[in-house]
Amino acid sequence: MVLLSVQQKYILETLRKLGCVRKDQLHALVRGKFQRPGFDISETRMAAMLRQLRSGLGDFHVDDDFVYLARGQPDTARLEAIDIMLELSAGAPQDFTVKVDSPQLLRFALDGDKLKVFSVAKLSHVSDPRLIQRERSERIVWISDSGTPLEGLTLPLKHFFAARQADGSHRFYGSNGP
């Protein structure tokens, strides 16, 4: 039996939801959830927690830049969706899930004056333009494999496109609608 800290339980919960994350993404999520004045989630502390989990749990893996449970595999689109969630939530989303319908990759909530829910979805050159129109009711951040918007892309209100920058961050473009 392994005794886990609250932070380690959160790490496992996060991996059960997301499958596979980069170390820097996991560190940002843990820091966003638990860091308070007088309690720092340093890289050293994070590395120690990951080491303890790896030695205590057989299905917990840390390889190079990735942390995952036994069946988790890196998915570049999902990893980019996690980056977007971290950027928009300043590393502290209220909640998130990957239990979404395709082409959505991730849904997350931002806390503030009003709870705001966003989805990150993948747009490809073969996507039906009606798909974008059908998804009008929610806030959606669209991404593409190329990291650039598709030619002639028109977005409805509350939809955004996340253009990937050279440093891995994103520039967000919104609709021109009312």
What are these regions (language model features)?
Residues 1-2:
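Intrinsically disordered, low-complexity serine/threonine- and proline-rich regulatory segments
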Residues 5, 38-39, 74-78, 150-155:
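Short, structured coil/loop segments at alpha-helix boundaries
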Residues 5, 10-18, 24-25, 52-116, ...:
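Nucleic-acid-binding surface
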Residues 21-38:
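Short acidic, hydrophobic short linear motifs in intrinsically disordered regions
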Residues 36-56:
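Short amphipathic alpha-helical interaction segments
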Residues 82-178:
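Electrostatic, structured charged patches in enzyme active sites and in nucleic-acid/phosphate-binding
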